[in-house]
Regions:
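Sec-dependent bacterial lipoprotein signal peptides
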Residues: 1-15
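Low-complexity, acidic/polar, glycine-enriched regions of mature
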Residues: 17-219
């Protein structure tokens, strides 16, 4: 049975106003996923994690943490990556850079709350590959399009990635790109009962989330 060794590093940055932001992924409506029959399906390693990093906008403040990969698969056909899905357990989100247990617990509860990822109602998030286009003569990277689902909201995102499929493994590396978290409802004032103060707090956190993905699949 073939095994997949997956290492995913998703650096999420709520970048400060003075920081140079990464290129923004093209975001649109969710796209239809077409099944690719006849290929090889490989299960993701259960020990994989997602790393995150967040910033405030107007002050120098950041935090780091991880989210566990719950399950998923990759699909390979004729030597190419043609599909796949990664499901993340949002209830597992933790902060790793705060030593004080009380402060760390407060942040983790806040991230799991309705203000952000609302894990009681939406315990998982997922990225499902729709299409992988080979690089052209003018482009170094492949172009990857997939459906990203957070808080039950699905949007398509398109970004460049270095995809290498060999007899030994599959390597997937996406240079840092950003998305707007508010398009997935991750904002204080998404609640009907949100106060003006809560809405102002959301403006202290940059709406751009920067993502960096590295995946290695060993056959």
């Amino acid at each position: 049975m073939k095994k997949l060794v997956l290492m995913v590093a998703l650096g999420l940055f709520f970048a400060t106003c003075n920081s140079e932001k990464a290129a923004e992924a093209t975001t649109g409506e969710a796209q239809k996923v077409i099944a690719n029959g006849g290929g090889e399906t490989v299960a993701l390693d259960s020990g994989s994690t997602v790393a995150w990093r967040g910033f405030k906008t107007y002050v120098q403040d950041e935090h780091l943490g991880t989210v566990n990969v719950q399950e998923g698969t990759f699909e390979v056909a004729e030597g190419k990556l043609v599909g796949g899905k990664i499901t993340m357990d949002m209830t597992s989100i933790i902060c790793t850079d705060i030593g004080n247990e009380r402060k760390r617990g407060y942040l983790e509860r806040h991230l799991r709350s309705q203000d952000f990822f609302f894990v009681d109602s939406f315990p998982t998030a997922a990225f499902e590959i729709v299409e992988v286009l080979d690089p052209s003569a003018a482009k170094k990277y492949s172009t990857v399009t997939g459906n990203l689902t957070i808080r039950g909201t699905t949007n398509s995102i398109t970004f460049p990635a270095d995809v290498v499929v060999s007899e030994e493994d599959v390597k997937f590396m996406a240079p840092t790109f950003s998305i707007d978290r508010t398009l997935w409802g991750a904002k204080y004032h998404d609640r009907d009962d949100a106060t003006i103060a809560e809405s102002l707090k959301d403006d202290l956190i940059d709406h751009s989330i920067e993502l960096t993905i590295e995946v290695k699949a060993t056959k």
